[in-house]
Amino acid sequence: MGKAKNKKKFLKNRKQVLVPGTLFVHSRKGFGFVSPDQPELYPFDIFISASDLKGALDGDHVLVALPFSLRGGEKRKGVIHKVLSRGKTVLVGTIVSLINPTLAMVYVNTIGPEHPLKAELLPKRTYKLGDRLLLKTPVWKENYPSREPPPLAMLEFIGNISNAKTDFPVIKAEFSITEEFPDAVVQEASQFLQKHVTQALHSRKDLRDLLCFTIDSSSAKDFDDAVSLTYDHEGNYILGVHIADVSHYVTPNSALDREAAKRCNSIYFPGKVIPMLPSALSDNLCSLKPNVDRLAVSVFMTFSKEGFLSDYRILRSVIRSKYRMTYDEVDEIIEKKQTHPISKTILKMAELSRIFSDIREQRGCTRLVLPSFTMSLDNLQEPVALIENKQTAAHKLIEEFMLKANEVIAYHISHQGITMPFRTHEPPNEESLLVFQETAKAMGFTITQTPAQEPDYQYLLQETTAGHPLEPILHSQFVRSMKTASYSTENKGHYGLCLDYYTHFTSPIRRYVDLIVHRLLFHPLSVEEEHLEQIVRACSSQERIAAKAEGAFVNIKKARFLKKFIEEQPATLYKAFIITASPEGISFVLPEFCHEGFIPAAKLPQAYVLQTKIGLEELPEHLRPGAVISVQLASVTLLTQSIEWTLVEATTKAKAKRTSKKKKTESVTTKEKKKSPAKKKKGATKTKKGSGKN
């Protein structure tokens, strides 16, 4: 087994180390990454190819073999050595062939199409191709796949893949999502009544006469933040951010707390939310509804007319929101000067928001233009439209105000000497950044190859691409080159926001970390430091799982959506932009569907194959990255969510701006440093505020 060295808990021999961690598998491409249990010792993810999974499944706790002689610049690639424990007790299988009435071959999404498995079927039912089944996870064997595993045991019939209503039960099972709350949790939540708000008034600041209000989407049910704006005697802004005081109701080690700690966050699907807290709290007592008294944590921040922070106060309060405003209503006031009782306040808020945005730009932070959409579903859960998420002035206003509150809270707690969960985002590594710069160069953009840590890098990216048709595509590629934001008790700063201090505080209804931050503000001894380390790891992990579940649900719905197009409009041509061209083929983006596609070289003109063998620089302009092409849907397979395309014709290349002027970064004296079927519709807003990706 080998000896422990320097307290590192891994097994060692001459050639490799065995590192424990959690496996995350790409549901369609088959490869995975292992996130080590000890990030302080292994501050990187380990890549696992599909052929090296050795029977391990998404979510498994594994031991991965990593070459011991790995040098600094080498890719961290490992092989699964052992499955320590299964991450899931059940799998979802889809029947691809029937052997006999009680035995079938099934496709399991987390294993891949190359390895269909046998499954024993429950009696007293007639099965057909496409039936979705709930199966018991097999025991891991060390000799996998040298010996055929025994048939999987069927637990439950879900429905046929042709029925769109089966998609959600499948996602729930695949990602171990619990929708219903235990009786003890529901009972505990229901014991709180409006009278508890009145009873708490004597120990809080009474802000019920303050003009504050919420700004959310028209479909929102949980309102966890309200805003206010007043002025001091010198004319400085006093911005108030008022957050629902969830910690008053969800106390340490209560049934509510234990359940919230399991879930870590709410999960958002098109038309459906799996909340972190029962509706008695999330949609009622903790929701800052208009004209009712609510418990809150209020942060008052004083800013100069130039937008720099000079003072702040944090207190527990009782507020009474005066209005429930929607993004659309606020935009009408800002852009069209629509008359409203609070229009003057909103216009001043918009003014302050623009000042904050300018300061962000001065310190080198840019607002990335990223394509985003919401899937609209009908009563049968069939997709009927893709609705573009438009980032409006109202969205930017709330985003800027929440960023300020999160920054101030992080600064305040950390300067009390209290260990806390930071929201950290490290700069891209050099290798990833070079790949991005090569992609940009291939598209015709020249971005100065300065270190990503320099404050002007993001600004240069914005200046180089601003207003160009390829802007959202290139910005998406830049985001992919960056590391994923996560939670940590070590303050590493936030690269994407260019901030020295940052945490999550503004959404305790839907994020457990925010709830912990609230406790640290007023009862820091209630959070044990050792327990906090476990919390940040669990919340980072659950955040990734939630994102994968949300993405998997959207993928199957998008496949259904495009399948309708190929059935009803098979000859339709779609405009696309080439992202990369390689000997393997071309990848491209279809803005109309916010979708990335790929055409293998075998299905491209023979000239393409010959030219890529000579060198990519020999490709004609109309087949190089950045070129505009026309593609046609060839096939859609619901089982694997595989979408195939055909290149129909090439048109012209979108001309990129080759140079940009470097804007001088102004010094900031305060800590102001461092989201037929109908086609896509415009003008819709996001259904949830602040995705939490920052």
UniProtKB/Swiss-Prot annotation:
Organism: Chlamydia trachomatis serovar D (strain ATCC VR-885 / DSM 19411 / UW-3/Cx)
Cellular component terms per the entry's GO annotation: cytosol
Name of the protein: Ribonuclease R
Alphabetical list of Gene3D superfamilies matching this protein: Nucleic acid-binding proteins
Domain RNB intervals: 204-525
Originating gene: rnr
Keywords (A to Z) from UniProt: Cytoplasm, Exonuclease, Hydrolase, Nuclease, RNA-binding
Domain of life: Bacteria
Region of interest (Disordered), residue spans: 652-694
InterPro entries: CSD, NA-bd_OB-fold, RNase_B_OB_dom, RNase_II/R, RNase_II/R_CS, RNase_II/RNase_R, RNase_R, RNR_Ribonuclease
Keyword Nuclease annotated: yes
Function per UniProt: 3'-5' exoribonuclease that releases 5'-nucleoside monophosphates and is involved in maturation of structured RNAs.
Family: Belongs to the RNR ribonuclease family. RNase R subfamily.
Main location, first listed in the record: cytoplasm
